[in-house]
């Protein structure tokens, strides 16, 4: 029979609409300003900490909507941001460095909805407010470090093969020049280097020298590796800040964008994300005298660094290990001297290296070198800020026994410095130093204004479209308008379910555009029905031919739009991608509501009936 859906298809439409309504409902309830308290150094918040937090809030007359202890962390909800900010400061002051106190926005979704995993969709920076950092990776520092590591490896490899050389020094474009003591060994040296370092370009400027340069492939590989590893570390640092729904992505060849929606403590975020500090552990060269240091008569494998009092310390250039082997750290006080210290835990490889080193250099001094990159106020020819490397010996201790993965570092100035250093080491040392080249803060009030304007635009667009459809298509306009509302509900529900989908102002523009495109499909169908009626077909045949005949045109038009959205997503960033996501999802949903959804309603109202007139 014409214009009748089988039962399974009607049930499918009802099920999809019901699921869409269910997962879009959390967006009605919004979010509460909240303070989240979680433990550091492997600790978890417990009932004792909960009692302290409740006492702080009661003492300062700060009312809460709720306060719960769950999964080792405490979440306190407030009615306004003023109470939230004051509570955060008071709680942090009471609990100290043993716990992380972070500002957050907690969904106010009822428990019965949370049982289904329903949560509100994520809002972008322009809607929620927050901070956006554009960070640039200093590739020069990365390539200099790679150059130093290469030269250190070459010295060991040439000595192992008994190839004598007089000098290994830097050349332009991060190259290395090896001057051989014996010209007859050049062929052997080149063969060894090609075997061990196949990505290097080898040239022969003179009979007794070999010039090594980084190939284009090696440069690109170094750049990509530095960016990807920095992205991983920055994600860990954002986790330390306790920020949910952060956006961290690469932009271009050497830049990283970080968006922290809802973050109000921007100074702390900037301090943690932009910090470049790390540690190196080096053996002190006791054979270098003070006189040799003053005359700069140092062995090729050693260099001088200074402690905080300005005293020189001769260190071997080769680090025992660096911050990349540190998997955990915590700050505290030394039990004997009550001075600040940082406890460090190494990975298995780092633990083995440290164990062998402390065995080899038993009763000899080892230094802890603090390394940080700072803005020196100058810019290069491309206008980029020049970062200057600052190194400082913060501790020299005699190795008193063999140890491995766990040890303590002293020599830091204060508890605060120890805590910051611990946080950075725990999240990982940046492979390449970075600098914040742009910082943009959007206040909650501006975000709220954007939300209001976006909602108003969507509502006015919806009202205008519905008014036109009701006026022009009568009862079929009612059906199309109902499908239009369901379209928005399904889109909101899908955006709430999809991980990584974030609603922004361009996304709202995509929704408004989707409204028009959804109605456009119905206009094609309805006009085709009217045309079939004018051609003398019965009403049931006209409805059937109207939907079947218009399908190809609707599918082709929407397919090209989806392909365009995919291209926008692939080549665009941030706002452009947000627009592309909502547009592509909206178009796909509009095909369902405009074709299958309205057909189900039309079939229910008119299917199988003898009709003499159709209100269209």
From Swiss-Prot:
Q: Where in the cell is it found?
A: Cell inner membrane
Protein keywords: Cell inner membrane, Cell membrane, Membrane, Protein transport, Translocation, Transmembrane, Transmembrane helix, Transport
Q: Which Gene3D superfamilies match?
A: 3.30.1360.200, 3.30.70.3400, Multidrug efflux transporter AcrB transmembrane domain
Domain of life, source organism: Bacteria
The answer to keyword Membrane applying to this record is yes
Q: Care to name a GO molecular-function term for this sequence?
A: protein-transporting ATPase activity
Task: Kindly list the residue ranges recorded as spanning the membrane.
Answer: 11-31, 453-473, 475-495, 497-517, 547-569, 585-605
**Pfam families the record matches:** Sec_GG, SecD-TM1, SecD_1st, SecD_SecF_C, SecDF_P1_head
Q: How does it sit in the membrane?
A: Multi-pass membrane protein
InterPro entries in the record, alphabetically? Answer: Acrflvin-R, SecD, SecD-TM, SecD/SecF_arch_bac, SecD/SecF_CS, SecD_1st, SecD_SecF_C, SecD_SecF_C_bact
Q: Which GO terms describe its cellular component?
A: plasma membrane
NCBIfam families, sorted: 2A0604s01, secD
Function statement = Part of the Sec protein translocase complex. Interacts with the SecYEG preprotein conducting channel. SecDF uses the proton motive force (PMF) to complete protein translocation after the ATP-dependent function of SecA.
Family, according to the entry, reads as follows: Belongs to the SecD/SecF family. SecD subfamily.
Per its record, how is this protein called by name?
A: Protein translocase subunit SecD
Protein's organism: Haemophilus influenzae (strain ATCC 51907 / DSM 11121 / KW20 / Rd)
